[in-house]
Amino acid sequence: MFKKRLISISLVVTLLISAKIMISDHLAKAHTLMVTANYTKESPEGIDDPKWREAQAVQLLVEGREKSTGDNGTVSTWSLYTDDSLYFLFKWKDPTRSITKQSWKYDGKNWHHLQGNEDRIALLFEITRIDKFATRGCAVTCHSPADEPRDNWKLATKTVTEKGDLWHWKAARSAPYNYADDAWLTVAGSPTGSYRETGRRKDAGKGGDLKNQTEDGTQPLYMQDPFKKPSVPEFLLLEEATKITDYSIFKAGDKIPFRLPIKPSGSRFDVKSISRYANGGWMVMLYRKLDTGHEDDVVFNSMKNYGFALAIFDDSGSDHSKTTEPMTLSFARK
């Protein structure tokens, strides 16, 4: 009798443990953030295209350094795909349209940088598997161990076999050319330029921006070419800029952009964008070929799922303010 009771108790405990594991697995799956791309035969032509109504919006909670609450912490996300391309539409509230990016202002005697940076949105996809990315998302690559000083944090993967595809839309630097800067992520190294010792690498091609300053950094070096009409109001494109030869032409209150967008090309120009700021918020459409043919990009297959993460930058030049939990991109069957 005693042995039977022990067997019964052991069986009950085993069943309870099994049930707990099953419930935990179910809850983990139930809380996975899923963004589903709906199939459409024709490409959406812009932000207002009726085709976006074919996709169901997913409300993604974003929070981080400046913890968000309510609608301010939500990014409405839609996704569509065609036979050869993938499309995203993002909408989020932002009380200010930040495109200043430290523009120059003349006070009548000297030039000074204005306060303010730019709004941005970034997506990171796995090209190859990144350890723990599926459960920790951006934190694995963007935030080094929490006990490390912030100055030691590196945007990187831990091994050379782990690679990420980074899409980085910037309101002041990429939006004027209607694209999101396409980069990829690997182990930390020593690349040239502003990326310093991170794992971030530029895709092949041209893009980015040039700092508009003299060698001593005290004043702007370029101005709008007076013989060229600005193709994008409020911005100074490098291809439309000319060197300043006479600073006496400026009067107090004059402003000149500090960051000059460079015309993009090649793989760096794979991710196109359409954007609009209105009614206290941004709407940004990003789209790209499912397969770009470039090794520095993830290849999307509509029969597979893909892990990714998203971050929102509010008037920020470095740390992102808000990020999502890890997410999965799936494709609805045709």
Regions flagged by a language model, labelled:
Residues 85-92, 282-288:
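Short, well-ordered beta-strand segments enriched in hydrophobic/aromatic residues
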Residues 81-83, 92-94, 290-292, 312-314:
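Beta-strand elements of well-folded, non-transmembrane domains
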Residues 10-18:
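Bacterial N-terminal signal peptides
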Residues 23-49, 104-251, 278, 293-334:
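Acidic/polar low-complexity flexible segments
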Residues 1-9:
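N-terminal Sec-pathway targeting helices
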Residues 75-78, 271-277:
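Beta-strand-rich interaction surfaces with strong enrichment in secreted/lumenal proteins
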Residues 245-275:
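A mid-sequence, solvent-exposed acidic-amphipathic segment
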Residues 79-80, 91, 302, 309:
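Mature extracytoplasmic or organellar-lumen-exposed domains after removal of signal/transit peptides
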